[in-house]
Amino acid sequence: MKENFWSELPRPFFILAPMEDVTDIVFRHVVSEAARPDVFFTEFTNTESFCHPEGIHSVRGRLTFSEDEQPMVAHIWGDKPEQFRETSIQLAKMGFKGIDLNMGCPVANVAKKGKGSGLILRPDVAAEIIQATKAGGLPVSVKTRLGYYEIDEWKDWLKHVFEQDIANLSIHLRTRKEMSKVDAHWELIEAIKNLRDEIAPNTLLTINGDIPDRKTGLELAEKYGIDGVMIGRGIFHNPFAFEKEPREHTSKELLDLLRLHLSLFNKYEKDEIRQFKSLRRFFKIYVRGIRGASELRHQLMNTQSIAEARALLDEFEAQMDEDVKIEL
């Protein structure tokens, strides 16, 4: 194996969760500007497309990263071990520091085809995939859920995953069936850690689910002794979620992050052509807590270009009464 960056991380370490159509190079740089985590994962990259001579062009932009983001982990999904083997070899050549396997995506057209969380029901295939991915020489990690249908599935499923000798397990503390409709099962963290200690003491354990910020993550790490904390949806509520010393933030800071997001979208669109409308999911992160925020969000949702969005921001900020402190 090439150098295992996981062993060099602080304890606990913090990771921005991989999120489809969210954690591209643009948003990762915005998060870095606000308060960066210790590790970044890419968006989801399909191994079948990556291995296809034509499909590679449709996914290459998902793997775009810059050296200042290191350690960078490629998050990949599929169900054909040989494709994982081939992909892992190429990812190592591209400069990634690790590979993370998606065994937790709950989306129906993924899971019901035996991919993502569907691999929970195919443990033998999951094991083959893990071993095949080691061909690239990078440390292999897994992101998964407690089970597919029932919470109690975690015992057999996670035991099986721990037996595969992986670098890190990120466990989303819900089942596939639960999606994100119920509270994450923090009450299971201690038992999962005990299982890890028994089966694979050298595998790092990262928890995920309902963790809004670094402060909460530190409290959980102190209580349970886990190695890492992964924050996903919490970043939408607080782009400063990874801040080491929390402080008050203002509406101007959030709007400045939006301007940065727009600029980076322009900069990197040559690497992966994305329609402008893909930006709309982010506006609610930056525009809130000030007079006129609702109307500005509505107007931004109807813009068709970076130039239009910037013009709206210029007009809005010129009329702002004051820089308001924001509750995050």
Curated annotation (Swiss-Prot):
Catalysed transformations (reactions): a 5,6-dihydrouridine in tRNA + NAD(+) = a uridine in tRNA + NADH + H(+); a 5,6-dihydrouridine in tRNA + NADP(+) = a uridine in tRNA + NADPH + H(+)
Cofactor: FMN
CDD domains: DUS_like_FMN
Gene3D superfamilies to which the protein is assigned, alphabetical: Aldolase class I, Putative flavin oxidoreducatase, domain 2
Active site residues of this protein: 105 (proton donor)
Record Pfam families: Dus
InterPro entries: Aldolase_TIM (IPR013785), DUS-like_FMN-bd (IPR035587), DUS_fam (IPR001269), tRNA-dHydroUridine_Synthase_C (IPR024036), tRNA_hU_synthase_CS (IPR018517)
UniProt GO molecular function: flavin adenine dinucleotide binding; tRNA binding; tRNA dihydrouridine synthase activity
Keywords linked to the UniProt accession: Flavoprotein, FMN, NADP, Oxidoreductase, RNA-binding, tRNA processing, tRNA-binding
Keyword Flavoprotein part of the UniProt annotation: yes
Annotated EC: 1.3.1.-
Sequence positions that bind FMN: 18-20, 143, 208-210, 232-233
Family: Belongs to the Dus family.
PANTHER family per UniProt: DUS-LIKE FMN-BINDING DOMAIN-CONTAINING PROTEIN, TRNA-DIHYDROURIDINE SYNTHASE
Function: Catalyzes the synthesis of 5,6-dihydrouridine (D), a modified base found in the D-loop of most tRNAs, via the reduction of the C5-C6 double bond in target uridines.
The protein's name in its UniProt record: Probable tRNA-dihydrouridine synthase
Record lineage: Bacteria, Bacillati, Bacillota, Bacilli, Bacillales
